[in-house]
């Protein structure tokens, strides 16, 4: 049976990404000039999903403005929470609008993945819930799963302490569900999918299946994760632009539409649409939209939209909020967020 619906939870404020999320919700932060969530929606569209419901909370108007699905041929609807209800609680609010089988995903991850394959695993195993899993080096910030030889999840623990870790396979936040599991979610109550609902289904003997994720997945929880996602897509899509004038470019690199790079050295850096970089050195830098950098050094740093960095300035290991001005000769460093 065709799976045609997906719910994407995009209600969080993205506090770990401050100051970048002071002015916009996390899912629309740019990854090579597309909203981060666009790649997930593209993955859903490629899997045959026809309708996506975005469960919005923080700055919903901006979500509507940047995510209409028209360029992907997919219908997007918006649902709104008056107060945070948790991931499972948000799905419960939509219960009467959902098909018997649907996809659900956290909207705060960067995911360019094979959702169709996960749907196939779910249907082949007759699971109640299928969870995309991926290995990480430090699983303590995530939910972890123990799986048997068939991929069935036998044990699941949310954000374990170091001494409690029994697996490096973590919940990647992309699920296929049978709607019937939402009957276990109490109405009008904060209820988390991983912490609350999954343990209930496991305790009842319901099949919770693990799926080994295929594609690129990143938790974009912190600013430097956003830089990593931009560099990963620049590399994967082989995005190169030769409009740079008298520039030395090394490593993965991207220039957005209307951007300009001249008389500069760029190492593993991303310059988004409308930004101008001249007479400067960038290394592992993300220069977001409509910035101006002239005669400066930007190292291991992120400039929010509309930033201006003047001659002789240095931005080292820092994250600048939208429209920050760094004056000539000024130095911003040591992990500061401005």
Which role fits each region the language model picked out?
Residues 102-103, 110, 119-123, 137-139, ...:
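Catalytic-core segments of class I nucleotidyltransferases/pyrophosphorylases
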Residues 188-189, 202-292:
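Extended, small-residue-rich solenoid/repeat segments and analogous flexible loops
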Residues 96, 277-338:
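Glycine-rich hexapeptide-repeat left-handed beta-helix
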Residues 1-8, 30-117, 321, 329-338:
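Conserved N-terminal catalytic core of the sugar/cofactor nucleotidyltransferase
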Residues 125-135:
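A short, conserved acidic/glycine-rich loop-to-beta-strand motif
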Residues 4-20:
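A phosphate-binding catalytic loop at a beta-strand-loop-alpha-helix junction
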């Amino acid at each position: 049976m065709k799976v045609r619906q997906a719910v994407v939870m995009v209600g969080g404020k993205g506090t770990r990404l401050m100051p970048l999320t002071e002015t916009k919700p996390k899912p629309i932060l740019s990854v090579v000039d597309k909203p981060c969530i666009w790649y997930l929606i593209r993955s859903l569209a490629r899997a045959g999903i026809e309708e996506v419901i975005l469960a919005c909370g923080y700055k919903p108007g901006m979500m509507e403005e940047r995510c209409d699905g028209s360029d992907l041929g997919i219908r997007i609807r918006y649902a709104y929470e008056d107060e945070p209800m948790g991931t499972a609680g948000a799905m419960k609010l939509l219960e009467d609008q959902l098909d018997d089988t649907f996809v659900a995903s956290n909207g705060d991850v960067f995911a360019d993945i094979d959702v169709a394959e996960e749907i196939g695993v779910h249907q082949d195993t007759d699971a109640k819930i299928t969870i995309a899993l991926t290995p990480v080096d430090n699983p303590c910030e995530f939910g972890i799963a123990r799986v048997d030889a068939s991929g069935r999840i036998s044990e699941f623990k949310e954000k374990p302490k170091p001494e409690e870790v029994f697996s490096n396979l973590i919940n990647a936040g992309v699920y296929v569900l049978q709607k019937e599991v939402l009957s276990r979610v109490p109405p009008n109550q904060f209820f988390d999918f991983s912490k609350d609902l999954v343990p209930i289904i496991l305790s009842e003997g319901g099949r919770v299946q693990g799926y080994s994720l295929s594609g690129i997945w990143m938790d974009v929880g912190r600013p430097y994760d956003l830089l990593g996602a931009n560099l990963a897509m620049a590399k994967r899509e082989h995005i190169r632009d030769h409009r740079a004038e008298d520039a030395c470019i090394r490593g993965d690199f991207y220039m957005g539409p209307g951007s300009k790079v001249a008389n500069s050295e760029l190492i593993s850096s991303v310059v988004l649409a409308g930004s101008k970089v001249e007479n400067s050195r960038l290394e592992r830098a993300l220069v977001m939209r409509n910035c101006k950098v002239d005669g400066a050094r930007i190292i291991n740093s992120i400039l929010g939209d509309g930033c201006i960095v003047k001659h002789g300035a240095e931005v080292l290991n820092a994250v600048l909020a939208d429209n920050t001005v760094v004056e000539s000769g000024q130095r911003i460093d040591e992990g500061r967020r401005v």
